[in-house]
Amino acid sequence: MLQSGEGSPTLPKRVFKIIVIGDSDVGKTCLTYRFCTGKFPEKTEATIGVDFRERTLDIDGEQIKLQLWDTAGQERFRKSMVPHYYRNVHAVVFTYDVTKGRSFQGLPSWIEECERYSLNASEIPRILVGNKCDLKDQAEVDTNSATRFADANSMPLFETSAKADSEMGNIEAIFLTVAHKLKSQKPMMKQDYPNMKRATVLSVDKEVLRTNEAPCSC
């Protein structure tokens, strides 16, 4: 059972930090925005540091909060932030653009970076997401290749589109899969909040440096 936190008497006791990583312009911001708001942003600002959103879920009667850290894909923007956003991570969502083969070819370097910070597959749930599947006629990464890569790295694969309204259920399934994997684990962060009727979507200004508005890469 998957629900948003609306109508719940309290916010969850268990909080999980999930980082969404991958090359620049693969649609990480739109993916997290779609999951947290149910909408596709017509415009977004390029993430230079870290953008932060969260959503409260009801998983089998237990309230769980997912904190989604959307990280910059460009190396020159990430160097000073890397130690910070890899701290206390509970799960990783690796993202590539199905229309850009280079973003898929770059996945091993993202996996290596995670392992340098001790985010090993045996300890940290990992998910592989191929975004922009609404542009299948422009695809440079076929499903079979992505499946082989996911299997080799012990990750489930989801192909979806943050832009297509019809894909909302698939996007929910991505994070529901993560939530179920995390539900049975010992929480690393605990919080006690006053009563609050709905989940919130937050942006941490101190962690985010932004450029001017630009069209979103879905």
UniProtKB/Swiss-Prot annotation:
Keywords, alphabetical: Cell membrane, GTP-binding, Lipoprotein, Membrane, Methylation, Nucleotide-binding, Prenylation
PANTHER family: PTHR47978
Protein's recorded name: Putative Ras-related protein Rab-33
Highest taxon, organism lineage: Eukaryota
GO cellular component: endosome; Golgi apparatus; plasma membrane
SMART domains listed in its UniProt record: RAB, RAN, RAS, RHO
Family indicated by similarity: Belongs to the small GTPase superfamily. Rab family.
InterPro entries: P-loop_NTPase, Rab33A/B, Small_GTP-bd, Small_GTPase
Residues that hold GTP according to the record: 22-29, 70-74, 131-134
Entry keyword Ribonucleoprotein: no
NCBIfam families per the UniProt record, alphabetical: small_GTP (TIGR00231)
Annotated GO biological process: Rab protein signal transduction
Lipidation (S-geranylgeranyl cysteine): C216, C218
